[in-house]
């Protein structure tokens, strides 16, 4: 911790009269300590936020590695990654639900493999295949995703 030594007032600042005995009041040192303490707390909060964001970005990177993204030359945004993960999970859920309706594994495997081919899986729900007017999520899942606005 810094020592409480007067460093001289800035130009044009009002100078408090010295306390009895020719020394500055103890309140000045306490004020400097409070400022230093606040600065330390701010630095600690910044470090915590930096670690939190690094953890969040690491989690998104790991999710991007497991979510299929055929034909993508660029890294998916966080929003696109979440949309792809949702679409992928829903497709897998649908396959498992329909698998329960069929007796053996061989009966249903061929029915759904086309959903995981490049031509049937899009970068994000709502994207269209070339020459297709129906939304992918509507065709695959039977629902229309609600529009989502990004806060700026």
From Swiss-Prot:
Keyword terms, alphabetized: Cell projection, Developmental protein, Differentiation, Disease variant, DNA-binding, Neurogenesis, Nucleus, Transcription, Transcription regulation
Effect listed in the UniProt record for changing residue 59 to V: Found in patients with bilateral optic nerve hypoplasia; uncertain significance; abolishes heterodimerization with TCF3 E47 isoform; reduces DNA-binding ability and abolishes transcriptional activation; no effect on nuclear localization
One Gene Ontology MF term: E-box binding
InterPro entries referenced in this protein's UniProt entry, alphabetically: ATOH7_bHLH, bHLH_dom, bHLH_transcription_factors, HLH_DNA-bd_sf
GO biological process, any: axon development
Cellular localization per UniProt: Nucleus; Perikaryon; Cell projection, Axon
Effect of residue 59 to T: Found in patients with bilateral optic nerve hypoplasia; uncertain significance; abolishes heterodimerization with TCF3 E47 isoform; reduces DNA-binding ability and abolishes transcriptional activation; no effect on nuclear localization
SUPFAM superfamilies: HLH, helix-loop-helix DNA-binding domain (SSF47459)
bHLH domain residues: 40-92
A cellular component annotation (GO) from this entry: cytosol
Job of this protein: Transcription factor that binds to DNA at the consensus sequence 5'-CAG[GC]TG-3'. Dimerization with TCF3 isoform E47 may be required in certain situations. Binds to gene promoters and enhancer elements, and thereby regulates a transcriptional program of retinal ganglion cell (RGC) determinant genes. Although the exact mechanism is not certain, retinal transcription regulation by ATOH7 has a role in RGC determination and survival, photoreceptor population development, targeting of RGC axons to the optic nerve and development of the retino-hypothalamic tract.
Subunit record text: Forms a heterodimer with TCF3 isoform E47; interaction may be required for DNA-binding in certain situations.
Known disease link: Persistent hyperplastic primary vitreous, autosomal recessive: A developmental eye malformation associated with microphthalmia, cataract, glaucoma, and congenital retinal non-attachment. It is due to failure of the primary vitreous to regress in utero, resulting in the presence of a retrolental fibrovascular membrane with persistence of the posterior portion of the tunica vasculosa lentis and hyaloid artery. Disease manifestations range from a trivial remnant of hyaloid vessels to a dense fibrovascular mass causing lens opacity and retinal detachment.
Protein name, per record: Transcription factor ATOH7
Annotated organism of origin: Homo sapiens (Human)
Protein's gene: ATOH7
């Amino acid at each position: 911790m810094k020592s409480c030594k007067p460093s001289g007032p800035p130009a044009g600042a009002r100078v408090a009269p010295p306390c009895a005995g020719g020394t500055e009041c103890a309140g000045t040192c306490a004020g400097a300590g409070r400022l230093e303490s606040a600065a330390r707390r701010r630095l600690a909060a910044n470090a915590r936020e930096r670690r939190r964001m690094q953890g969040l970005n690491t989690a998104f990177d790991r999710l991007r590695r497991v979510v299929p993204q055929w034909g993508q030359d660029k890294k998916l945004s966080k929003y696109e990654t979440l949309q792809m993960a949702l679409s992928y999970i829903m497709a897998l859920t649908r396959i498992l639900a329909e698998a329960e309706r069929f007796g053996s594994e061989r009966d249903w495997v061929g029915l759904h493999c086309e959903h995981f081919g490049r031509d049937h899986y899009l970068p994000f729900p709502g994207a269209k295949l070339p020459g297709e007017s129906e939304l992918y999520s509507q065709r695959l899942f039977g629902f229309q995703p609600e529009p989502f606005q990004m806060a700026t």
